[in-house]
Amino acid sequence: MTTQQQATPSGGAEWQQRPERSSLFMLRLMTWLSLRLGRGASRVVLYVIAAYFLAFAPTARRMSRDYLRRVLQLAAPAAVGWRHLFRHFLCFASVIHDRIYLLNGRFELFDIRVHNQDLIDKVVADGQGVFLLGAHLGSFEVLRAIGRQQPGLRVAMAMYEENARKINAALGAINPEAQQDIVALGHIDSMIQVHELLGQGTVVGMLGDRSLGQDDTRAFDFLGAPAELPLGPFRMAAILRRPVLFMTGLYRGGNRYDIHFEALADFSKVPPRGRTLAVQAAMARYAVLLAYYCRSAPYNWFNFFDFWHAPQPRPSRSPEKNQPTP
């Protein structure tokens, strides 16, 4: 795997500038129907949602085609057929649909299998705060389900403020009683809040595959081409001197999810002068693990934007507030 040594401003803000497709009214309606009709009957609507994206979301369709060509190792985007695209959108709709049941405590509906559980068990036993670094790959919600079932495992999420606002709104639409710890990043006291949670033994989850336009990034080989990854999550873990686990909850079809934990990095004993190299090594391993699990479950990738975009120049002034993203 190759790396670019200099920090580059990310063009990943594209995902922020898209108009919000989701409607809280529709989400509430879908939640109402799903909880009353049951998971099996309400899944019929998922085919309609997948067909809608296939027909009326050209950007998502194009990005899906580009990603699938890379992960399936096909010769050209044209080799990705409508069947591949429909399956990709259907997997996305299925995971969003299952979130309704997971947030409402309907864990008995699912077959959730945990791999390398000893890694997270050790965290709980030691009372040690740790970072969980995931991606828009599969479902993070299944981890929260495990957290509610396992005494002593408290999970919080650290994310950008706009995402935090939308997640809270979505949670309220799905289940107003759902308790969710979310730390909005980008404030002066954000790192202090994260530090306090870690000190209480909380597992703090972050997603390491998207950034804001003004964020520093590093470029790593991902599925055969350079892709920019945000430096922020890794830098925070290094500054706070905490271990980091990679986590993904892959949807395998039917009612089955596989949660995978992998040791990613341990910054607890890294001196300040060694942070740069340690962060670089952690990001390199993250890119390798992300590619590995993408190949393991190719239709679980839910980054429907140009992930392999060319770097854009850093703006000379503060960027205007971006529009929300789906």
PLM region descriptions:
Residues 2-134, 170-172, 177:
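Membrane-anchoring hydrophobic helices of lipid-metabolizing enzymes
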Residues 14-15, 49-50, 105, 155-157, ...:
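A short, structure-level motif marking secondary-structure boundaries and short turns
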Residues 76, 84, 95, 126-187, ...:
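Catalytic core of membrane glycerolipid acyltransferases/transacylases, capturing the structured
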Residues 115-117, 158-160, 185-187, 262-264, ...:
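Conserved beta-strand termini and adjacent loop/short-helix elements that scaffold enzyme active sites
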